[in-house]
Amino acid sequence: MSSVNVDFEQAGELKIGQVGIANLRIRTLDVPRLVREMQDRVTRAPKLFGRAAVILDFGGLAQTPDLATAKALLDGLRSAGVLPVALAYGTSEIDLLSQQLGIPLLAKFRAQYETAAVSPPPPPPPPPARAEPAAPVARPAPGRMQRNAVRSGQQLYAENCDLTVLSTVGAGAEVIADGSIHIYGTLRGRALAGAQGNPDARIFCRDFHAELVAIAGHYKVLDDVPMDLRGKAVQVWLEQDQIKIAALD
């Protein structure tokens, strides 16, 4: 079974969201390097990243960038071919920076910062009064099945479940699932599994020509896939934050 797993450390980690907006989490505040990396992404996959909406996430930095540096980064990313549209929610300094830059602050990222905040330990809970009957456990939603082809420009989303496609996913089409994705035809478009962050989701495909595959936001484009895996039946999974692709025996 052949596989691919390329390990590298980039200044910015780009994750693909379920609504087509990418989240660029800044690891190293090196503006020229970040711009070069984005130019490389756009060059390798212009249909995917050209004029893509990007959210900037400074939460991984020890210090919020100053206004001049942030402006230089926004200008550089625009020149690289993408469109910075917002900052990810963070500290009060990031809130102020978003106002100075004149771009929105997206509160959908609030939880990842608030859970990391240091807070005093909670007081001990009061002794339980009496045992209450256990609440019924919700059953997972049944998987979604798509019998017809998913054509160019169409997007299919399976919320809180797996997605099974019995036909082809055409070039320019997008299939998304919070769980795993099973494609019994040809995959020429994009497949995004674990869209709500599930790292255990997988993608299974009978005929692999995907423009992009992603699991929990981590992605790989077709140009990064070895030729010997194209046109094969494959599985795609996430291991140590790296996409791995292997032929099915």
From Swiss-Prot:
Keyword Transferase: no
Gene Ontology biological-process annotations: cell morphogenesis; division septum assembly; regulation of cell division; regulation of cell septum assembly
Positions with biased composition (Low complexity): 131-142
Highest rank taxon of the organism: Bacteria
Keywords of this entry: Cell cycle, Cell division, Septation
Amino acid composition bias (Pro residues), ranges on this chain: 119-130
Family of this protein: Belongs to the MinC family.
Function (record text): Cell division inhibitor that blocks the formation of polar Z ring septums. Rapidly oscillates between the poles of the cell to destabilize FtsZ filaments that have formed before they mature into polar Z rings. Prevents FtsZ polymerization.
Protein's UniProt name: Probable septum site-determining protein MinC
Lineage of the organism: Bacteria, Pseudomonadati, Pseudomonadota, Gammaproteobacteria, Lysobacterales
